[in-house]
């Protein structure tokens, strides 16, 4: 098929990874995929690696910036819009698909001005600033979590595109004649509160329910985190990164982690129960809303960072580790919330809009 699609996503993996999954699906259907990003985001590494054409515009976020930056903002946004319009004219896409990040504001407006159908995908339970603005004139809005957007005539609940290898056929049976396996995820940059909390909490558990521990600490945090475990007499494998997440999820019986949108979707895909500690200063407290999606159905417990010390974490760990059937039930519930067709569904929506 001789047709171009322009994907907009930038900044963090939370925006870029779902967009990459959809880019591969577009390519499988014969579309040529172009990508609109910014010079400083993770897309600069990942998009060329995927063999996609990357176009860059100069735009940054405005939250938390000083007065001088805010005074310069209108000029920056105007320049970014002009750059985005040039890309849209050059690519001539049948549709423009935004997955979030600063790039989507100017890019989405450029699509609107050019009369090109715009579709946006929101990964979080609370829409980001750019997507909230674009939703008013987008042709369609895809949401990972139900009722993120108010306009039911435009929205489609698709789930988050995640790696297909994470979808286990059936959830594992936890504690099947062995020690429980606890996976701690701090994210690529690490979550120092989790790195401090878990060693102390695990040291308070009775020896007979001590789990095997695999702790992803984040870059430059592995040595000190491993030392914390040694100091309290808890055996743990500590790594700065986990290269094979599918293998790690397949190993685990229980996960302690933040509540980023992709993490929530991956936990559901893998059918894993979790103890979620939302990032307390996330924009619009979106991680708490993400966590509620699993917690209200019984697939997770939410443990606010401000009220969760070592004693509280130890008590919750003891509760779930001593009840294998509860872990199994949480795992089944998590798996029931997965959206295995999310990638295809998002691309189907785009194709319908582009050619409908």
Swiss-Prot record:
Matches recorded under SUPFAM superfamilies: UDP-Glycosyltransferase/glycogen phosphorylase
EC number in record: 2.4.1.227
Topology class, membrane: Peripheral membrane protein
Keyword Repressor belongs to the record: no
CDD domains reported in the protein's UniProt record: GT28_MurG (cd03785)
First-tier enzyme category under EC: transferase
Coiled coil: none
Annotated S-S bridges: none
Keyword Cell membrane: yes
One MF annotation (Gene Ontology) recorded for this entry: UDP-N-acetyl-D-glucosamine:N-acetylmuramoyl-L-alanyl-D-glutamyl-meso-2,6-diaminopimelyl-D-alanyl-D-alanine-diphosphoundecaprenol 4-beta-N-acetylglucosaminlytransferase activity
Gene Ontology CC terms: plasma membrane
Binding site for UDP-N-acetyl-alpha-D-glucosamine: 12-14, 124, 163, 188, 242, 287
Localization per record: Cell inner membrane
Lineage top rank: taxon: Bacteria
Keywords: Cell cycle, Cell division, Cell inner membrane, Cell membrane, Cell shape, Cell wall biogenesis/degradation, Glycosyltransferase, Membrane, Peptidoglycan synthesis, Transferase
Catalytic activity: di-trans,octa-cis-undecaprenyl diphospho-N-acetyl-alpha-D-muramoyl-L-alanyl-D-glutamyl-meso-2,6-diaminopimeloyl-D-alanyl-D-alanine + UDP-N-acetyl-alpha-D-glucosamine = di-trans,octa-cis-undecaprenyl diphospho-[N-acetyl-alpha-D-glucosaminyl-(1->4)]-N-acetyl-alpha-D-muramoyl-L-alanyl-D-glutamyl-meso-2,6-diaminopimeloyl-D-alanyl-D-alanine + UDP + H(+)
Gene3D superfamilies given in the database record: Glycogen Phosphorylase B
InterPro entries: GlcNAc_MurG, Glyco_trans_28_C, GlycoTrans_28_N
Family annotation (Pfam families): Glyco_tran_28_C, Glyco_transf_28
Purpose of the protein: Cell wall formation. Catalyzes the transfer of a GlcNAc subunit on undecaprenyl-pyrophosphoryl-MurNAc-pentapeptide (lipid intermediate I) to form undecaprenyl-pyrophosphoryl-MurNAc-(pentapeptide)GlcNAc (lipid intermediate II).
HAMAP family in alphabetical order: MurG
The protein's name in its UniProt record: UDP-N-acetylglucosamine--N-acetylmuramyl-(pentapeptide) pyrophosphoryl-undecaprenol N-acetylglucosamine transferase
Provenance organism: Pseudomonas syringae pv. syringae (strain B728a)
Taxonomic lineage from the root: Bacteria, Pseudomonadati, Pseudomonadota, Gammaproteobacteria, Pseudomonadales
The gene coding this protein: murG
């Amino acid at each position: 098929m001789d047709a171009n699609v322009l994907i907009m996503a930038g900044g963090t993996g939370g925006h870029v990874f779902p967009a990459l999954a959809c880019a591969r699906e577009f390519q499988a259907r014969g579309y040529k995929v172009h990508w609109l990003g910014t010079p400083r985001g993770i897309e600069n590494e990942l998009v060329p690696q995927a063999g996609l054409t990357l176009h860059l515009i100069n735009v940054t976020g405005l939250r938390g910036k000083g007065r001088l930056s805010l005074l310069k903002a209108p000029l920056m946004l105007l320049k970014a819009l002009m750059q985005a319009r040039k890309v849209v004219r050059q690519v001539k896409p049948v549709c423009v698909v935004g997955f979030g990040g600063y790039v989507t504001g100017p890019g989405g407006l450029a699509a609107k001005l050019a009369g090109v159908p715009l579709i946006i995908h929101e990964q979080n339970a609370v829409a980001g600033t750019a997507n909230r603005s674009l939703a008013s004139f987008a042709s369609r809005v895809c949401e990972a979590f139900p009722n993120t957007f108010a306009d039911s005539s435009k929205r489609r609940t698709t789930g988050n595109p995640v790696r297909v290898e994470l979808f286990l056929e059936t959830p594992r049976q936890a504690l099947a004649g062995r020690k429980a396996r606890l996976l701690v995820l701090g994210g690529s940059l690490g979550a120092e509160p989790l790195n401090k909390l878990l060693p102390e909490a695990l040291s308070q558990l009775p020896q007979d329910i001590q789990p095997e521990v695999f702790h992803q600490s984040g870059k430059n945090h592995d040595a000190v985190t491993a030392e914390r475990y040694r100091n309290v007499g808890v055996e743990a494998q500590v790594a700065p990164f986990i290269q094979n997440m599918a293998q790690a999820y397949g190993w685990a019986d229980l996960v302690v982690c933040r509540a980023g949108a992709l993490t929530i979707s991956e936990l559901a895909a893998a059918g894993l129960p979790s103890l979620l500690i939302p990032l307390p200063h996330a924009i619009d407290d979106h991680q708490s809303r993400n966590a509620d999606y699993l917690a209200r159905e019984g697939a997770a417990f939410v443990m606010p960072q401000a009220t969760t010390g070592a004693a509280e974490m130890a008590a919750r760990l003891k509760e779930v580790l001593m009840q294998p059937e509860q872990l199994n039930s949480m795992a089944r519930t998590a798996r029931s919330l997965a959206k295995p067709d999310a990638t295809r569904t998002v691309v189907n929506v785009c194709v319908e809009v582009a050619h409908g």
